[in-house]
Design a protein with these regions (language model features):
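PLP-dependent amino-acid enzyme catalytic core
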Residues: 1-424
Length: 424
Protein backbone atom coordinates (compact mmCIF):
# COMPACT_ATOMS: atom_id res chain seq x y z
CA UNK A 1 0.00 0.00 0.00
CA UNK A 2 1.36 3.39 -0.99
CA UNK A 3 0.27 6.58 0.73
CA UNK A 4 1.04 10.23 0.09
CA UNK A 5 1.18 13.33 2.25
CA UNK A 6 -1.85 15.52 1.51
CA UNK A 7 0.21 18.67 2.18
CA UNK A 8 3.27 17.52 0.22
CA UNK A 9 2.39 14.96 -2.45
CA UNK A 10 6.06 14.29 -3.12
CA UNK A 11 6.33 12.52 0.25
CA UNK A 12 5.23 8.93 -0.35
CA UNK A 13 5.42 6.10 2.18
CA UNK A 14 4.42 2.48 2.67
CA UNK A 15 1.70 1.44 5.12
CA UNK A 16 4.30 0.31 7.66
CA UNK A 17 6.10 3.65 7.38
CA UNK A 18 2.84 5.58 7.77
CA UNK A 19 1.91 3.56 10.86
CA UNK A 20 5.32 4.11 12.45
CA UNK A 21 5.59 7.76 11.41
CA UNK A 22 2.04 8.93 12.11
CA UNK A 23 2.33 12.30 10.36
CA UNK A 24 4.18 13.52 7.30
CA UNK A 25 6.16 16.67 6.66
CA UNK A 26 4.46 19.94 7.69
CA UNK A 27 2.03 17.95 9.87
CA UNK A 28 0.57 16.48 6.69
CA UNK A 29 -1.86 13.57 6.84
CA UNK A 30 -1.16 10.40 4.89
CA UNK A 31 -3.80 9.17 2.46
CA UNK A 32 -3.95 6.03 0.26
CA UNK A 33 -2.88 6.45 -3.36
CA UNK A 34 -5.36 3.79 -4.48
CA UNK A 35 -8.87 3.06 -3.22
CA UNK A 36 -9.97 0.53 -5.82
CA UNK A 37 -13.53 -0.77 -5.30
CA UNK A 38 -13.84 -4.27 -3.88
CA UNK A 39 -14.67 -6.99 -6.39
CA UNK A 40 -17.74 -8.64 -4.84
CA UNK A 41 -19.21 -6.60 -2.01
CA UNK A 42 -22.38 -8.71 -1.78
CA UNK A 43 -20.34 -11.85 -1.12
CA UNK A 44 -18.22 -10.00 1.43
CA UNK A 45 -21.31 -8.89 3.30
CA UNK A 46 -22.24 -12.54 3.85
CA UNK A 47 -19.01 -13.21 5.79
CA UNK A 48 -18.43 -12.89 9.55
CA UNK A 49 -16.95 -9.61 10.81
CA UNK A 50 -13.34 -10.76 11.32
CA UNK A 51 -13.07 -12.70 8.04
CA UNK A 52 -14.66 -9.88 6.04
CA UNK A 53 -12.46 -7.26 7.72
CA UNK A 54 -9.31 -9.25 6.95
CA UNK A 55 -10.29 -9.40 3.27
CA UNK A 56 -11.06 -5.66 3.13
CA UNK A 57 -7.74 -4.74 4.72
CA UNK A 58 -5.81 -7.23 2.57
CA UNK A 59 -7.38 -5.55 -0.47
CA UNK A 60 -6.20 -2.16 0.80
CA UNK A 61 -2.73 -3.21 1.94
CA UNK A 62 -1.94 -5.26 -1.17
CA UNK A 63 1.33 -7.17 -1.22
CA UNK A 64 2.90 -5.22 1.62
CA UNK A 65 1.37 -7.39 4.34
CA UNK A 66 0.63 -11.08 3.60
CA UNK A 67 -3.05 -12.02 3.84
CA UNK A 68 -2.32 -14.52 6.61
CA UNK A 69 -0.65 -11.77 8.67
CA UNK A 70 -3.57 -9.40 8.13
CA UNK A 71 -5.94 -12.12 9.30
CA UNK A 72 -3.77 -12.68 12.38
CA UNK A 73 -3.78 -8.96 13.22
CA UNK A 74 -7.55 -8.67 12.78
CA UNK A 75 -8.33 -11.78 14.82
CA UNK A 76 -6.21 -10.40 17.66
CA UNK A 77 -7.86 -6.97 17.48
CA UNK A 78 -11.54 -7.61 16.65
CA UNK A 79 -12.55 -9.93 19.48
CA UNK A 80 -15.98 -8.38 20.11
CA UNK A 81 -19.20 -7.82 18.10
CA UNK A 82 -20.81 -4.69 16.64
CA UNK A 83 -24.55 -5.48 16.73
CA UNK A 84 -27.13 -3.53 14.77
CA UNK A 85 -30.23 -2.91 16.91
CA UNK A 86 -33.58 -1.88 15.42
CA UNK A 87 -35.46 0.77 17.39
CA UNK A 88 -39.21 1.18 17.63
CA UNK A 89 -39.08 4.18 15.29
CA UNK A 90 -37.58 2.00 12.54
CA UNK A 91 -34.05 3.39 12.73
CA UNK A 92 -31.05 1.23 13.52
CA UNK A 93 -28.34 1.72 16.14
CA UNK A 94 -24.90 0.31 15.37
CA UNK A 95 -23.49 -0.46 18.82
CA UNK A 96 -19.74 0.02 18.75
CA UNK A 97 -19.22 -0.17 22.51
CA UNK A 98 -18.82 -3.90 23.14
CA UNK A 99 -15.00 -3.85 23.25
CA UNK A 100 -12.80 -3.77 26.35
CA UNK A 101 -13.08 0.00 26.91
CA UNK A 102 -16.73 0.25 25.83
CA UNK A 103 -16.19 2.65 22.92
CA UNK A 104 -15.85 2.55 19.13
CA UNK A 105 -12.18 3.43 19.38
CA UNK A 106 -11.40 -0.10 20.55
CA UNK A 107 -11.53 -1.14 16.87
CA UNK A 108 -8.89 1.31 15.68
CA UNK A 109 -6.80 1.35 18.84
CA UNK A 110 -6.39 -2.41 19.03
CA UNK A 111 -5.61 -2.79 15.33
CA UNK A 112 -3.03 -0.02 15.51
CA UNK A 113 -1.37 -1.64 18.52
CA UNK A 114 -1.15 -4.95 16.69
CA UNK A 115 0.32 -3.22 13.61
CA UNK A 116 2.92 -1.26 15.54
CA UNK A 117 4.00 -4.34 17.45
CA UNK A 118 4.31 -6.26 14.16
CA UNK A 119 6.21 -3.50 12.34
CA UNK A 120 8.41 -2.42 15.25
CA UNK A 121 12.15 -2.40 14.83
CA UNK A 122 14.43 -2.55 17.87
CA UNK A 123 14.09 1.20 18.36
CA UNK A 124 12.01 2.58 21.20
CA UNK A 125 8.57 3.93 20.30
CA UNK A 126 6.76 6.65 22.26
CA UNK A 127 3.09 7.04 21.44
CA UNK A 128 1.96 10.62 22.13
CA UNK A 129 -1.73 11.23 21.76
CA UNK A 130 -4.44 13.63 22.86
CA UNK A 131 -7.90 12.51 23.90
CA UNK A 132 -11.25 14.17 24.46
CA UNK A 133 -12.43 11.01 26.18
CA UNK A 134 -12.60 7.65 24.45
CA UNK A 135 -9.30 7.56 22.53
CA UNK A 136 -7.33 7.57 25.77
CA UNK A 137 -8.91 4.42 27.13
CA UNK A 138 -8.82 2.54 23.83
CA UNK A 139 -5.16 3.37 23.20
CA UNK A 140 -4.07 2.75 26.79
CA UNK A 141 -5.65 -0.69 26.97
CA UNK A 142 -4.54 -1.66 23.46
CA UNK A 143 -0.87 -0.85 24.19
CA UNK A 144 -0.72 -1.72 27.89
CA UNK A 145 2.16 -4.09 28.54
CA UNK A 146 3.50 -4.11 24.95
CA UNK A 147 7.28 -4.36 25.07
CA UNK A 148 9.31 -1.42 23.77
CA UNK A 149 6.33 0.93 23.44
CA UNK A 150 5.63 3.76 25.87
CA UNK A 151 2.34 5.66 25.72
CA UNK A 152 1.80 9.27 26.85
CA UNK A 153 -1.78 10.54 26.78
CA UNK A 154 -2.79 14.20 27.12
CA UNK A 155 -6.34 15.12 28.13
CA UNK A 156 -8.12 18.35 29.14
CA UNK A 157 -8.24 18.50 32.92
CA UNK A 158 -11.80 18.40 34.26
CA UNK A 159 -13.34 18.15 30.80
CA UNK A 160 -13.87 14.40 30.41
CA UNK A 161 -16.19 12.22 32.46
CA UNK A 162 -14.77 10.78 35.70
CA UNK A 163 -15.34 7.25 34.42
CA UNK A 164 -13.57 7.96 31.14
CA UNK A 165 -10.63 9.29 33.15
CA UNK A 166 -10.54 6.24 35.41
CA UNK A 167 -10.40 3.86 32.45
CA UNK A 168 -7.02 5.07 31.21
CA UNK A 169 -5.43 6.97 34.11
CA UNK A 170 -5.22 4.01 36.49
CA UNK A 171 -3.06 1.56 34.53
CA UNK A 172 0.51 2.70 35.17
CA UNK A 173 3.31 0.63 33.67
CA UNK A 174 4.06 1.80 30.13
CA UNK A 175 1.01 4.12 30.17
CA UNK A 176 1.60 7.70 31.37
CA UNK A 177 -1.22 10.23 31.51
CA UNK A 178 -1.13 14.03 31.74
CA UNK A 179 -4.05 16.29 32.71
CA UNK A 180 -3.51 19.51 30.74
CA UNK A 181 -4.83 22.83 32.03
CA UNK A 182 -6.74 23.65 28.85
CA UNK A 183 -9.24 22.28 26.35
CA UNK A 184 -8.84 19.43 23.84
CA UNK A 185 -7.65 21.78 21.11
CA UNK A 186 -4.84 22.89 23.46
CA UNK A 187 -3.90 19.22 23.92
CA UNK A 188 -3.85 18.67 20.15
CA UNK A 189 -1.73 21.79 19.69
CA UNK A 190 0.86 20.39 22.13
CA UNK A 191 0.96 17.10 20.23
CA UNK A 192 1.50 18.98 16.96
CA UNK A 193 4.33 21.00 18.53
CA UNK A 194 5.99 17.78 19.64
CA UNK A 195 5.82 16.40 16.11
CA UNK A 196 7.38 19.61 14.80
CA UNK A 197 10.38 19.09 17.10
CA UNK A 198 12.70 16.92 15.00
CA UNK A 199 15.22 16.41 17.81
CA UNK A 200 12.49 15.25 20.18
CA UNK A 201 10.97 12.93 17.56
CA UNK A 202 14.30 11.25 17.01
CA UNK A 203 15.21 11.06 20.71
CA UNK A 204 12.08 9.26 21.86
CA UNK A 205 10.77 7.63 18.65
CA UNK A 206 7.61 9.72 18.55
CA UNK A 207 4.40 8.36 17.04
CA UNK A 208 0.71 9.20 17.37
CA UNK A 209 -2.31 7.04 18.09
CA UNK A 210 -4.95 9.62 17.20
CA UNK A 211 -7.13 9.00 14.18
CA UNK A 212 -4.46 10.83 12.20
CA UNK A 213 -2.69 7.44 12.21
CA UNK A 214 -3.82 5.60 9.09
CA UNK A 215 -4.03 2.20 10.80
CA UNK A 216 -6.79 3.40 13.10
CA UNK A 217 -8.70 4.88 10.22
CA UNK A 218 -8.57 1.74 8.06
CA UNK A 219 -9.74 -0.44 10.95
CA UNK A 220 -12.79 1.79 11.38
CA UNK A 221 -13.77 1.23 7.74
CA UNK A 222 -14.62 -2.35 8.66
CA UNK A 223 -17.54 -1.66 10.98
CA UNK A 224 -19.39 0.28 8.30
CA UNK A 225 -19.45 -2.93 6.28
CA UNK A 226 -20.66 -4.73 9.41
CA UNK A 227 -23.55 -2.27 9.77
CA UNK A 228 -24.72 -2.75 6.19
CA UNK A 229 -24.25 -6.53 6.39
CA UNK A 230 -26.85 -6.65 9.17
CA UNK A 231 -29.44 -4.61 7.26
CA UNK A 232 -32.11 -6.34 5.17
CA UNK A 233 -30.69 -6.65 1.64
CA UNK A 234 -33.46 -4.52 0.15
CA UNK A 235 -32.57 -1.67 2.53
CA UNK A 236 -28.84 -1.45 1.97
CA UNK A 237 -28.66 0.98 -0.94
CA UNK A 238 -31.16 3.25 0.87
CA UNK A 239 -29.07 3.49 4.03
CA UNK A 240 -28.24 6.89 5.49
CA UNK A 241 -25.65 6.75 8.26
CA UNK A 242 -25.48 9.47 10.90
CA UNK A 243 -22.03 9.77 12.46
CA UNK A 244 -21.20 11.52 15.76
CA UNK A 245 -18.31 13.72 14.69
CA UNK A 246 -15.49 15.34 16.67
CA UNK A 247 -12.12 14.91 14.99
CA UNK A 248 -13.89 13.46 11.90
CA UNK A 249 -11.91 10.24 11.67
CA UNK A 250 -15.12 8.25 12.00
CA UNK A 251 -16.77 10.01 9.08
CA UNK A 252 -13.59 9.71 7.00
CA UNK A 253 -13.66 5.95 7.52
CA UNK A 254 -17.28 5.80 6.38
CA UNK A 255 -16.49 7.72 3.21
CA UNK A 256 -13.56 5.40 2.49
CA UNK A 257 -15.96 2.45 2.88
CA UNK A 258 -18.28 4.06 0.33
CA UNK A 259 -15.33 4.58 -2.03
CA UNK A 260 -14.58 0.86 -1.73
CA UNK A 261 -18.08 0.05 -2.92
CA UNK A 262 -20.14 -0.15 0.27
CA UNK A 263 -23.76 0.33 -0.88
CA UNK A 264 -24.86 3.27 1.27
CA UNK A 265 -26.73 6.32 0.05
CA UNK A 266 -25.17 9.10 2.12
CA UNK A 267 -23.78 10.24 5.46
CA UNK A 268 -24.69 12.85 8.06
CA UNK A 269 -21.97 14.56 10.10
CA UNK A 270 -23.50 15.13 13.54
CA UNK A 271 -21.78 17.59 15.89
CA UNK A 272 -22.48 19.35 19.15
CA UNK A 273 -22.11 23.11 19.67
CA UNK A 274 -18.54 22.82 18.36
CA UNK A 275 -19.98 23.04 14.86
CA UNK A 276 -17.12 24.26 12.67
CA UNK A 277 -17.90 21.75 9.91
CA UNK A 278 -21.71 22.20 9.69
CA UNK A 279 -21.19 25.97 9.49
CA UNK A 280 -18.48 25.51 6.86
CA UNK A 281 -20.73 23.32 4.72
CA UNK A 282 -23.44 26.01 4.86
CA UNK A 283 -21.34 29.12 4.35
CA UNK A 284 -18.08 27.97 2.78
CA UNK A 285 -16.21 29.82 5.54
CA UNK A 286 -13.83 27.85 7.80
CA UNK A 287 -14.24 29.70 11.11
CA UNK A 288 -13.39 27.63 14.20
CA UNK A 289 -14.76 29.15 17.39
CA UNK A 290 -13.39 28.75 20.89
CA UNK A 291 -14.09 25.16 21.98
CA UNK A 292 -17.00 24.90 24.39
CA UNK A 293 -17.59 22.12 26.92
CA UNK A 294 -20.71 20.02 26.26
CA UNK A 295 -22.46 16.87 27.44
CA UNK A 296 -20.95 15.07 24.42
CA UNK A 297 -17.37 15.84 25.41
CA UNK A 298 -15.70 13.44 22.95
CA UNK A 299 -16.93 15.80 20.21
CA UNK A 300 -15.66 18.99 21.88
CA UNK A 301 -13.34 19.72 18.95
CA UNK A 302 -13.36 22.99 17.00
CA UNK A 303 -10.41 22.19 14.72
CA UNK A 304 -10.94 18.63 13.49
CA UNK A 305 -7.64 17.14 12.34
CA UNK A 306 -9.16 14.68 9.87
CA UNK A 307 -11.19 17.17 7.85
CA UNK A 308 -8.47 17.52 5.16
CA UNK A 309 -8.87 13.79 4.46
CA UNK A 310 -12.62 14.26 3.91
CA UNK A 311 -11.95 17.05 1.43
CA UNK A 312 -9.19 15.08 -0.30
CA UNK A 313 -11.38 12.01 -0.79
CA UNK A 314 -14.34 14.05 -2.03
CA UNK A 315 -12.06 15.87 -4.46
CA UNK A 316 -10.66 12.62 -5.84
CA UNK A 317 -14.06 10.95 -6.17
CA UNK A 318 -15.80 14.01 -7.55
CA UNK A 319 -18.23 14.07 -4.64
CA UNK A 320 -19.63 17.50 -3.84
CA UNK A 321 -19.14 18.37 -0.17
CA UNK A 322 -22.60 19.90 -0.24
CA UNK A 323 -24.12 16.41 -0.59
CA UNK A 324 -22.80 15.55 2.87
CA UNK A 325 -25.55 16.00 5.44
CA UNK A 326 -24.65 17.82 8.63
CA UNK A 327 -26.06 19.53 11.67
CA UNK A 328 -25.50 20.36 15.32
CA UNK A 329 -27.31 19.90 18.61
CA UNK A 330 -26.74 21.93 21.75
CA UNK A 331 -26.97 20.46 25.25
CA UNK A 332 -30.68 21.23 25.67
CA UNK A 333 -31.48 19.42 22.42
CA UNK A 334 -29.20 16.55 23.45
CA UNK A 335 -31.07 16.14 26.73
CA UNK A 336 -34.40 16.10 24.90
CA UNK A 337 -33.12 13.51 22.42
CA UNK A 338 -31.90 11.22 25.21
CA UNK A 339 -35.34 11.38 26.82
CA UNK A 340 -37.12 10.57 23.55
CA UNK A 341 -34.79 7.64 22.93
CA UNK A 342 -35.53 6.35 26.42
CA UNK A 343 -39.25 6.55 25.61
CA UNK A 344 -38.45 4.22 22.69
CA UNK A 345 -36.94 1.82 25.25
CA UNK A 346 -33.41 2.52 24.05
CA UNK A 347 -30.78 3.65 26.53
CA UNK A 348 -28.21 5.86 24.82
CA UNK A 349 -25.61 8.48 25.71
CA UNK A 350 -25.12 12.06 24.44
CA UNK A 351 -23.02 11.38 21.31
CA UNK A 352 -25.34 8.71 19.93
CA UNK A 353 -28.38 10.80 20.86
CA UNK A 354 -27.14 13.69 18.73
CA UNK A 355 -26.59 11.39 15.75
CA UNK A 356 -30.07 9.87 16.18
CA UNK A 357 -31.78 13.25 16.49
CA UNK A 358 -30.19 14.67 13.34
CA UNK A 359 -30.93 11.43 11.49
CA UNK A 360 -34.62 11.79 12.32
CA UNK A 361 -34.61 15.38 11.12
CA UNK A 362 -32.89 14.69 7.79
CA UNK A 363 -34.12 11.20 6.81
CA UNK A 364 -36.46 10.99 3.81
CA UNK A 365 -39.44 8.60 3.75
CA UNK A 366 -37.79 6.23 1.28
CA UNK A 367 -34.50 6.04 3.21
CA UNK A 368 -33.30 3.71 5.96
CA UNK A 369 -31.60 5.34 8.92
CA UNK A 370 -28.56 4.06 10.83
CA UNK A 371 -26.82 5.97 13.61
CA UNK A 372 -23.57 5.09 15.33
CA UNK A 373 -23.56 4.50 19.08
CA UNK A 374 -19.95 5.21 19.90
CA UNK A 375 -19.87 4.62 23.67
CA UNK A 376 -21.66 2.63 26.37
CA UNK A 377 -24.18 4.79 28.31
CA UNK A 378 -22.37 3.94 31.56
CA UNK A 379 -19.30 5.84 30.36
CA UNK A 380 -21.45 8.95 30.79
CA UNK A 381 -23.23 7.72 33.89
CA UNK A 382 -23.36 11.09 35.65
CA UNK A 383 -25.17 12.91 32.85
CA UNK A 384 -27.33 9.95 31.76
CA UNK A 385 -28.44 9.26 35.34
CA UNK A 386 -29.30 12.92 35.90
CA UNK A 387 -31.15 13.44 32.61
CA UNK A 388 -33.13 10.19 32.73
CA UNK A 389 -33.45 9.87 36.52
CA UNK A 390 -31.77 6.45 36.41
CA UNK A 391 -28.95 4.58 38.09
CA UNK A 392 -27.14 3.04 35.11
CA UNK A 393 -25.21 -0.03 36.33
CA UNK A 394 -21.48 -0.12 35.64
CA UNK A 395 -20.28 -2.92 33.33
CA UNK A 396 -17.36 -4.99 34.61
CA UNK A 397 -14.49 -2.98 33.07
CA UNK A 398 -15.82 0.32 34.41
CA UNK A 399 -16.62 -1.06 37.86
CA UNK A 400 -13.09 -2.43 38.16
CA UNK A 401 -11.35 0.81 37.25
CA UNK A 402 -13.74 3.07 39.18
CA UNK A 403 -12.16 1.91 42.44
CA UNK A 404 -8.53 2.51 41.40
CA UNK A 405 -6.52 5.69 42.16
CA UNK A 406 -5.69 8.17 39.39
CA UNK A 407 -2.03 8.16 38.34
CA UNK A 408 -2.07 11.31 36.19
CA UNK A 409 0.26 14.27 36.51
CA UNK A 410 -0.91 17.85 35.98
CA UNK A 411 0.80 20.19 33.50
CA UNK A 412 0.02 23.62 32.06
CA UNK A 413 -0.58 23.91 28.31
CA UNK A 414 3.08 24.82 27.72
CA UNK A 415 5.23 22.86 25.28
CA UNK A 416 8.45 23.41 27.23
CA UNK A 417 6.93 21.65 30.24
CA UNK A 418 5.64 18.77 28.11
CA UNK A 419 9.00 18.38 26.38
CA UNK A 420 10.81 18.20 29.71
CA UNK A 421 8.37 15.53 30.86
CA UNK A 422 8.89 13.46 27.70
CA UNK A 423 12.68 13.46 27.80
CA UNK A 424 13.00 13.29 31.59
Amino acid sequence: MNLYNIKDNSEQVSFAQAVRQGLGREQGLFFPEQLEPLADVDALLDLPLAERSARILSHLLGDEVPAAKVSELINAAFTFPAPLVKLKDGTYALELFHGPTLAFKDFGGRFMAQCLAAFRTNDKITILTATSGDTGAAVAHAFFGLEGIEVVILYPKGKISPLQEKLFCTLGGNIRTIAIDGDFDACQALVKQAFDDEALKKAIGLNSANSINISRLLAQVCYYFEAVAQLPKASRAKAVISVPSGNFGNLTAGLIAKALGLPVKRFIAATNANDTVPRYLKTGQWEPHQTVATLSNAMDVSRPNNWPRVEELCRRKGWALETLGSGMRDDAQTRAALKRLHQLDYLCEPHGAIAWDLLGEQLAEDEVGVFLCTAHPAKFKESVDEILNLDVPLPGPLAKHAELPLLSVNLPAEFARLRAFLVG
